[in-house]
A protein has these predicted regions:
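Membrane-proximal envelope and lipid/glycan-remodeling enzymes
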Residues: 78-90, 148, 153-166
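Acidic, Mg2+-coordinating phosphoryl-transfer loop and its flanking beta/alpha structural elements
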Residues: 123-159
């Protein structure tokens, strides 16, 4: 969900720039996590922000995700799977965010879990750890932290997802 249909990186940058005098911008080195771009003494701030109630409630939508996912539902049984248990405060935020921005996804097609051990035909994700032992077709959704990964079929945008799957 995060970095695939919702944008937590942009929100982190906004919060960081609000709280610190040295601005952080959207230019993130390939293969690095966002928190590697802040001074060492405030590196943990990322984890504080994402553990705050409300952090996930107003994230921006990844462009074209709504339209393409709605179209995918005409051809596939679509599930939203999020490893939300890692950040327990996010459960209600993510549920409410999905209800607002993806109301066409039935609540029975939303899975909050610890590990994405789902058995599906296709998984679109930004984290390669979720593809370990995954039996289906993994599609790696581009995010700064995975730009150096070459082992998986990559999609950079939801338009590319549509081109491959519709």
């Amino acid at each position: 969900m995060d970095e695939v249909i919702a944008d937590p990186i942009k929100k982190f940058i906004q919060l960081y720039n609000r709280d610190y005098t040295v601005p952080l911008d959207l230019k993130i080195d390939a293969g690095n996590e966002i928190y590697h771009h802040v001074p060492k003494d405030v590196e943990q701030k990322w984890f504080e922000y994402i553990n705050e109630p409300g952090f996930f409630r107003d994230l921006e939508i990844i462009p074209d995700s709504q339209r393409v996912i709605k179209a995918l539902q005409q051809k596939y049984e679509v599930y939203i799977v999020s490893a939300a248990m890692e950040f327990p405060n996010c459960l209600k935020d993510k549920h409410d965010w999905l209800a607002d921005h993806f109301p066409f996804i039935d609540w029975q097609h939303i899975i909050f879990c610890g590990n994405k051990i789902v058995n599906t035909d296709i998984m679109i994700d930004d984290r390669i750890k979720n593809f370990v032992n995954y039996p289906g077709r993994p599609l790696l959704f581009t995010s700064p932290h995975n730009l150096l990964v070459t082992d998986y079929e990559r999609v950079n945008t939801w338009e590319e997802v549509a081109g491959l799957l519709l």
